[in-house]
């Protein structure tokens, strides 16, 4: 009797705690740990598991998926994947013209610069666009000089204006033939990046919507009811026996 009761209680508790579903897969250990810590700071039940190729995946309660995505999106996660030189210039690639090689090289450099800028605290999105120089246009006149545009979307509570000279210097030193005064930087603050959701969180237990704070009490109450069932049945049995 006691074994059956304990087993029933354990099964109920495991059922009530719910099952977790994949939130994001194929993310790096570093980024995954940052995302996991962020979700737990917001009060969500989140875990990580190993994934393919040394990556990891994040899991959350099915009822928390929408909120988890919203929290991570406002914090700039998951970060964008950028192309590397190896991606742009594969070993088995076909021979390209000098202009094509230069374009691919500058694209790879722009990707690397974007990756570097995205590592700055508070940067949500970083883009670098490079315009190649034109030696001569169709009318024989001198072509347009090379230029670059940098777009950064950042947290609203961080002042990025002071970083503009360093950002321009980084781009200037990374791309050959690009003049400092031909680099423009556009900063766009994200008004809600650092806002945290303080609304009460609800969870579903046996199709009953309860607040996260009441979840433990409801599980305890239902477990107690299961424990009382065999006791009441036994008491009823003895009462019927005495009547006979």
Curated annotation (Swiss-Prot):
InterPro entries: AMP-bd_C_sf, FliF_N_dom, T3SS_SctJ, YscJ/FliF. The keyword Signal applies. A lipid is attached at residue 19 (N-palmitoyl cysteine). A lipid is attached at residue 19 (S-diacylglycerol cysteine). Its main location: membrane. Keywords: Cell outer membrane, Lipoprotein, Membrane, Palmitate, Plasmid, Protein transport, Signal, Transmembrane, Transmembrane helix, Transport, Virulence. It is found in: Cell outer membrane. The chain crosses the membrane at residues 218-238. It is a lipid-anchor. Induction: At 37 degrees Celsius in the absence of calcium. GO terms for cellular component: cell outer membrane. Residues 1-18 form the signal peptide. One of its GO terms (biological process) is protein secretion. Required for the export process of the Yop proteins. Belongs to the YscJ lipoprotein family. This is Yop proteins translocation lipoprotein J.
């Amino acid at each position: 009797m006691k074994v059956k009761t304990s087993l029933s209680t354990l099964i109920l508790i495991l059922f009530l705690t719910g099952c977790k579903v994949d939130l994001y897969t194929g993310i790096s250990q570093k980024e995954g740990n940052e995302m996991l810590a962020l979700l737990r700071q917001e009060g969500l039940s989140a875990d990580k598991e190993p994934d393919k190729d040394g990556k990891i995946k994040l899991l959350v309660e099915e009822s928390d998926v929408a909120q988890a995505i919203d929290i991570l999106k406002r914090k700039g996660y998951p970060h964008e994947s950028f192309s590397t030189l190896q991606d742009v210039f594969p070993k088995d690639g076909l021979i390209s013209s000098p202009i094509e090689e230069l374009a691919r090289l500058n694209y790879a450099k722009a990707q690397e610069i974007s990756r570097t800028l995205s590592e700055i605290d508070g940067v949500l999105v970083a883009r670098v666009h490079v315009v190649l120089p034109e030696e001569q246009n169709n009318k024989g006149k001198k072509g347009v000089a090379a230029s670059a545009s940098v777009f950064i979307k950042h947290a609203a509570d961080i002042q990025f204006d002071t970083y503009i000279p360093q950002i321009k210097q980084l781009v200037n030193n990374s791309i050959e033939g690009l003049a400092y005064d031909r680099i423009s930087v556009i900063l766009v603050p994200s008004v809600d990046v650092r806002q945290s959701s303080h609304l009460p969180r609800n969870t579903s237990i046996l199709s009953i919507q309860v607040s996260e704070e009441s979840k433990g009490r409801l599980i305890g109450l239902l477990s107690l009811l299961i424990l009382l069932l065999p006791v009441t049945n036994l008491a009823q049995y003895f009462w019927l026996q005495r009547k006979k």
